[in-house]
């Protein structure tokens, strides 16, 4: 019996390579011991042509995220995984599974594409306080009919370049020039410069900059969400990968038990023929064989399903044939420190950070709503230079700057809201929402601490379960070896040996299950803490 080594100790028989032809694809159960080295290249998974295709798509995505207007003339065209090229089974390590998911998982690709739109939302918010340009133009033809006199046709053309800008204090500056050109080539442009400044309602950076600050917070949170989204997918890949290992071990365990049950049945048949056992002495064993056959069938179906789930989670072709290791490595069993984990979660947990950002946005909305209750007092000034019509023949641009035709005006506008329920409603809603989100933030903080506490308690319990499972395997192995010696001495039956061997197989299956449960709980904790990418030494290619 080939034994698998981990931490210098024999743990369980290595699972032989199992190949199953699945309706929608093919996979192989756990093979030899040990995991594929994480440094193994992905070249055997990705052809040179596919590598080139990936590189070009990555470059397009990078350009689109850095400059979203790249999408006006181009497509990103992220590639999906190619069809399986290898008919032979390929060994897949956990690190390889994660790296392939980073390239082909559709949820990760969608999150990367979302960054294009998200970056442009920030650009839109910044554009509010940038210089705005526009060019307007119009042409008109008027025809008049005068009874007894005749007809008259007049044509007019107007081209108006416009520039305006809004500052963070609420000041609005505008500049436009009306260019009038008629049929007599009488060009007489008019330049208008205007300025408006609210003094109460709409005044101040806190009011006018609120949307921009919200957009900046949203952009920062979008980066965090991208990391969290990738972390969630990686955790799913890890879970699916370990589930396949567990289902493969379960299948192999059920097959071994069925094999041993058939051996016992054959031995009993010989004893019945020799008169050493009653003719009905094999009925119970026949029932055991049928029960185990059913369990093997169920285990085979679970294994096939787990294989397809892993391929789908990674984003690979369903017809890909792969094998995974028969065991997982735990290394040193550790329980994370509770206080350190809570501190890290409060700094990096995406949902909690999103709630804090929402609270900040509510505070800004409350400030804006309070400002909206004030009187609307606006001062403005306007300077017009030039002439609409030319009366002395000195037309052209000189009419703008010669100082002869300047009109200056100033104004103040006051609007006093009286029983304006809409404005009052805005303030009421803002205060209620702010109060609710304050309570929600406190509740979410407590819920996060509770979740971290429960998770670490589970990790501690699973660590003890794993250590107990190791001892159980050791004792079951000793019991099995003892029964073998008894059988050789003639004081133990084959049935006794089979029973102790089944106990050993069950203990080994329990050990694998305990290890995977412990590791999965650690992976889930890393996901909640926001440290999954750091743990796997992954740096996002785009969007940060």
Residue ranges and their predicted role:
Residues 101-102, 164, 277, 281-282, ...:
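Amphipathic alpha-helical coiled-coil scaffold segments and their short linker/junction regions
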Residues 223-344, 458, 462-465, 503-505, ...:
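Periplasmic alpha-helical coiled-coil/stalk elements that build and connect Gram-negative outer-membrane
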Residues 109-113, 126, 168-188, 199-224, ...:
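Sec/SRP-type N-terminal targeting helices
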Residues 83-89, 136-197, 325-335, 367, ...:
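Small/polar, glycine/serine/threonine/aspartate-rich low-complexity segments that form flexible
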Residues 156-158, 190, 239, 284, ...:
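Transmembrane beta-barrel architecture of outer-membrane proteins
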Residues 7, 26-63, 71, 80-86, ...:
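Acidic, low-complexity, intrinsically disordered peripheral segments
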Residues 58-61, 117-120, 125-127, 247, ...:
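Short segments within alpha-helical structural elements
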Residues 74-100:
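Regulatory alphaC helix of protein kinase catalytic domains
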């Amino acid at each position: 019996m080939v034994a698998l080594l981990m931490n210098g100790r024999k743990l369980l028989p290595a699972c032989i390579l199992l190949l199953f032809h699945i309706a929608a694809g093919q996979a192989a159960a756990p093979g030899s011991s040990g995991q594929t080295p994480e440094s193994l290249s992905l070249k055997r998974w990705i052809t040179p042509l596919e590598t080139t295709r990936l590189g070009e798509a990555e470059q397009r995505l990078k350009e689109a995220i850095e400059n979203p207007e790249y999408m006006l003339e181009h497509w990103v065209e992220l590639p999906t995984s190619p069809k399986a090229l290898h008919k032979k089974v390929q060994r897949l390590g956990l690190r390889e599974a994660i790296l392939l998911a980073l390239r082909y998982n559709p949820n990760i690709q969608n999150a990367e594409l979302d960054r294009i739109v998200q970056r442009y939302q920030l650009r839109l918010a910044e554009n509010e306080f940038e210089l705005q340009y526009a060019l307007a133009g119009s042409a008109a033809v008027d025809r008049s009919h005068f009874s007894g006199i005749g007809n008259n046709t007049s044509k007019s053309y107007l081209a108006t370049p416009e520039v305006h800008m809004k500052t963070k204090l609420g000041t609005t500056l505008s500049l436009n020039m009306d260019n009038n050109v008629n049929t007599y080539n009488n060009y007489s442009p008019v330049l208008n410069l205007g300025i408006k400044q609210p003094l109460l309602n709409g005044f101040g950076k806190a009011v006018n900059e609120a949307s921009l600050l919200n957009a900046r917070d949203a952009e920062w949170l979008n980066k965090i969400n991208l990391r969290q989204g990738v972390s969630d997918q990686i955790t799913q890949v890890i879970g699916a990968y370990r589930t396949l290992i567990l289902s493969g071990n379960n299948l192999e365990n059920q097959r071994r038990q069925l094999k041993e049950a058939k051996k016992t049945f054959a031995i009993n048949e010989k004893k019945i023929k020799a008169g050493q056992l009653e003719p009905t002495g094999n009925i119970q064993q026949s029932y055991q064989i049928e029960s185990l056959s059913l369990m093997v069938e169920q285990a085979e179906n679970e294994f096939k399903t787990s294989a397809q789930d892993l391929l789908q989670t990674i984003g690979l072709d369903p017809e890909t044939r792969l094998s995974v290791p028969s065991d997982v490595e735990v290394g040193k069993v550790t329980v994370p420190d509770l206080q350190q984990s809570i501190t890290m979660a409060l700094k990096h947990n995406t949902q909690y950070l999103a709630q804090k950002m929402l609270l900040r946005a509510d505070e800004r909305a409350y400030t804006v709503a309070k400002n909206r209750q004030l009187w609307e007092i606006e001062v403005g000034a306007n300077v017009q230079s030039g002439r609409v019509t030319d009366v002395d023949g000195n037309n052209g641009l000189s009419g703008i700057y010669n100082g002869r035709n300047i009109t200056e005006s100033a104004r103040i506008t006051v609007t006093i809201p009286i029983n304006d329920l809409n404005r009052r409603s805005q303030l009421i809603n803002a205060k209620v929402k702010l109060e609710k989100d304050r309570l929600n933030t406190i509740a979410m903080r407590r819920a996060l601490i509770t979740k971290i506490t429960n998770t670490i308690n589970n990790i501690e319990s699973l660590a003890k379960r794993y250590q107990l499972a190791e001892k159980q395997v050791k004792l079951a192995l000793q019991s099995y070896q003892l029964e073998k010696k008894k059988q050789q001495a003639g004081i133990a039956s084959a049935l006794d040996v089979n029973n102790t061997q089944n106990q050993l197989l069950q203990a080994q299956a329990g050990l694998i299950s305990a290890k995977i449960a412990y590791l999965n709980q650690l992976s889930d904790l890393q996901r909640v803490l926001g440290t999954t990418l750091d743990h796997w030494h992954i740096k996002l290619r785009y969007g940060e």
